[in-house]
From Swiss-Prot:
Tissues and organs where the protein is expressed, per its UniProt entry: Brain-specific. Expressed in fetal and adult brain. Up-regulated in synovial carcinomas.
Region of interest (Disordered), ranges: 221-315, 445-579
Basic and acidic residues bias spans: 282-298, 447-467, 530-547
Organism name: Homo sapiens
Gene Ontology annotations for the cellular component aspect, listed alphabetically: cell cortex
Keyword Coiled coil: yes
Protein name according to UniProt: PDZ domain-containing protein 4
Length: 769
């Protein structure tokens, strides 16, 4: 219910006392009884509240009862209309005065709600806003609690006291506490009876409220110069039409009859979202160039009330309506108004859809104002309008159709703009990479050959020829070489095409090998290994340049992750030389062997321009590291900077796998595998280390057990066996003699007594020699 008048929460609210609820006296009841009465009361709730005024009057004869407020819950359904007349409480006699002028007088609700002093400069600082609330059925509730005055003061207006958080009005977000309701569905309301009668009508599913509030400070940002600059940029044809319509309309009806297709500056509740969403209405240089930022290019537009077609109908009104009007166009208003652009300037949106969008916005604004279609702008009232309006149809049905079509066009326009921004971001990144490659190549060509350790080959630690891993992640990066080609525009391609081959070749004299056949057209570019033939390399480079787009300078093919400038620097020209693992001890002799092999008389010694250029190119982004093999030996390797490598690698993997589905993965010959992050790889290493320790412990325990069995003394075991055998024989011998004794037993063993305790001497004594 949202009533908090019976519980004192703030010190300044201690003077509030609830008098009646639906005609029942509550002033003498306790707090628990008051709560019980509120819970048991039926809707609609009519609450009469008494408060003390902080401003005492000299001619007042009553000291305690100064002001009386009465509030009515407005979420009234059709079933409660009949009960409303019966439950209406007796109110004090009201003094009927003339309604105050709408355009120049305003009573701040904070005066009588909180007792603040009245300001003299508040008369002209008013802001009007028309809010439309849509209900799916007449049983839905708006969720507004209105308050009105019942004392002898001149203020007879109706104010919004509270907004239910989960109601229709709260979801709309434009109605705030303290707003004064001027009109309901175009009808001026002066007292509670009129408001309740209009709000409780059954056929009203769409309710239009004209509210007034003090002008927000954000509305003063725009000056006349800003408005003139805005009109110069986007055309002022609609400005003249709006001025002509404003001069024809009476002053009292201006708030209800004027519409803009852009959303002007609203109150503080919507200022933040409008600042984030709208990038068109601001004319300063910093915001005009805002599209160059990465955040704007990503197209993250937060949802706000200005994105919906129903929120395009906001307006602010001050003392001089012509001079103080503020225009604030959002992204929707750019497409709606035209803004000096044609339909062809928006990619993906045809001219017909563009014109249709503008016409729908104009028709919607006129229908919401209650005007006829004959009063539309000339371009909307002509024969181009495809909307057939039947005067007999309901206004709500027509508005629903317009809303649906507008939402469809807005959704399409937003997707087009977001895709365009993402394309611009990709183009900028690719251009930056290409420029970086060119600059590094020029720098490498001008430097002398002065790097003594530049020929240390960066090769995998383990060479598993049987490995078929298609992805260089985790342990597989040490088992398979990378087959890559550099960027088509990169100058490294010319040197690498003639002097390097990523397929490993044993050291020895150069052997003439036939050039590899060209790959089939359907094979992807990332599986084409670099050819050793210079002519083939030049032809392939020319073909790559021919496939480039002349406008943007970008390749039409999808660039794989290996063609990233960061990954392409890992591969240098190796020519015919073999693979060497260098340790700190063997570094000098190995270097001498390499120089001897690349001498002028060596068969394997060829031009090494590509290797030098590549080494100089990757120098700023490489670092020397001492690696440790599994057997404990150490070697020096040149590795790229890890953060750049991992960042580029993760970005390319994400781009490649974004459009990959299960069916594509099953059909494709290359299995993408799974990409493990850095933390996951650390966990894998820890888990593998623990398993290895566990296996070593088990093997050591088994070896110790076997060693003890082999080296142990066998005598105790034999003694135990002999003793057991002897004990078994004794038991068997005892069971041989029983009461049934044969002659042979008598002769051999003697006789046993009846009790079995004594054995007599045998008759025969046999001695075996």
């Amino acid at each position: 219910m949202g009533c908090n008048m019976c519980v004192v929460q703030k010190p300044e609210e201690q003077y509030k006392v609830m008098l009646q609820v639906n005609g029942k006296e509550l002033s003498k009841l306790s707090q628990e009884q008051t709560l019980q009465a509120l819970r048991s009361s039926k809707e609609p709730l009519v609450i009469q509240v008494l408060r003390r005024s902080p401003r005492l009057r000299g001619d007042s004869s009553c000291h305690d009862l100064q002001l009386v407020d009465s509030g009515t819950q407005t979420d009234i359904t059709f079933e409660h209309i009949m009960a409303l007349g019966k439950l209406r409480p007796p109110t004090p006699p009201m003094v009927i005065l003339e309604p105050p002028p709408i355009s120049h007088e305003y009573y701040d609700p904070a005066e009588f709600m909180e007792g603040g002093p009245q300001e003299a400069d508040r008369l002209d600082e008013l802001e009007y806003e028309e809010v439309e609330l849509y209900k799916s059925s007449h049983r839905d509730k708006l969720g507004l609690m209105v308050c009105y005055r019942t004392d002898d003061e001149e203020d007879l207006g109706i104010y919004v006291g509270e907004v239910n958080p989960n109601s229709i009005a709260a979801k709309d977000g434009r109605i705030r506490e303290g707003d004064r309701i001027i009109q309901i569905n175009g009808v001026d309301v002066q007292n509670r009876e009129e408001a309740v009668a209009i709000l409780s009508q059954e056929e009203n599913t769409n309710i239009s409220l004209l509210v007034a509030r003090p002008e927000s400070q954000l509305a003063k940002r725009w000056k006349d110069s800003d408005r003139d600059d805005f009109l110069d940029d986007f055309g002022s044809e609609n400005e003249g039409e709006l001025r002509a319509r404003k001069l024809k309309s009476p002053p009292a009806q201006q708030p209800g009859n004027e519409e803009e297709k852009g959303a002007p500056d609203a109150g503080p509740g919507l200022s933040n979202s409008q600042e984030l969403d709208s990038g068109v209405g601001r004319t300063d240089e910093s915001t005009r160039n805002e599209e160059s930022s990465e955040h704007d290019l990503l197209g993250d537009e937060p949802p706000s009330s200005t994105n919906t077609p129903g929120s395009l109908r906001k307006f602010g009104l001050q003392g001089d309506a012509l001079q103080s009007r503020d225009f604030h166009f959002s992204m929707d208003s750019l497409l709606a108004e035209g803004a000096g652009l044609g339909g062809g300037d928006v990619p993906g949106l045809t001219d017909e859809e563009y014109e249709r969008y503008r016409e729908l916005l104009e028709i919607k604004c006129h229908l919401e104002n209650g005007n006829q279609l004959g009063l539309l702008f000339p371009r909307a009232s002509g024969g181009n309008s495809a909307l057939d309006v039947n005067r007999n149809e309901s206004l709500g049905h027509e508005m629903a159709m317009l809303e649906e079509e507008l939402r469809h066009l807005e959704f399409k326009c937003r997707n087009i703009l977001r895709a365009q921004k993402m394309q611009q971001l990709r183009e900028r990144c690719m251009k930056a990479w290409l420029l970086e490659e060119e600059s590094l190549y020029d720098l490498a060509a001008s430097e002398p050959k002065k790097h003594e350790l530049s020929d240390i080959s960066e090769l995998p630690e383990k060479s598993d020829k049987d490995s078929t891993s298609a992805y260089n992640t985790g342990e597989s990066c040490r088992s398979t070489p990378l087959l890559v080609e550099p960027l088509p525009e990169s100058p490294l391609r010319r040197a690498m095409a003639g002097n390097s081959n990523l397929n490993r070749t044993p050291p020895g004299p150069a052997v003439a090998t036939p050039a590899k056949a060209a790959p089939p057209p359907g094979s992807p570019a990332k599986f084409r290994s670099l050819s050793r033939d210079p002519e083939a390399g030049r032809r392939q480079h020319a073909e790559e340049r021919g496939r480039r787009n002349p406008k943007t300078g970008l390749t039409l093919e999808r660039v794989g992750p290996e063609s990233s400038p960061y990954l392409s620097r890992r591969h240098r020209g190796q020519g015919q030389e073999g693979e060497h693992y260098h340790s700190c001890v063997q570094l000098a002799p190995t270097r001498g062997l390499e120089e001897l092999g690349h001498g002028p008389l060596s068969l394997a010694g060829g031009p090494r321009v590509g290797g030098v250029a590549a080494a100089a190119t990757e120098a700023p982004r490489m670092e020397w590291k001492v690696k440790v093999r599994s057997d404990g030996t150490r070697y020096v390797a040149k590795r790229p900077v890890r953060d750049r490598l991992l960042k580029a690698r993760a970005l390319k993997i994400r781009e490649e796998r974004s459009g990959m589905t299960t069916d594509d993965d099953a059909v494709s010959e290359m299995k993408m595998g799974r990409y493990w992050s850095k933390e996951e790889r650390k966990q894998h290493l820890i888990r593998a280390r623990e398993q290895r320790k566990r296996r070593e412990f088990m093997m050591q325990s088994r070896l110790e057990c076997l060693r003890e069995q082999q080296n142990g003394d066998s005598k105790p075991e034999l003694n135990i066996i002999a003793l057991s055998h002897r004990k078994t024989m004794k038991k068997r011998n005892k069971k041989i003699l029983d009461n049934w004794i044969t002659i042979q037993e008598m002769l051999a063993h003697g006789a046993r007594s009846a009790d079995g305790k004594r054995v007599y001497n045998p008759l025969l004594s046999v001695t075996t020699v």
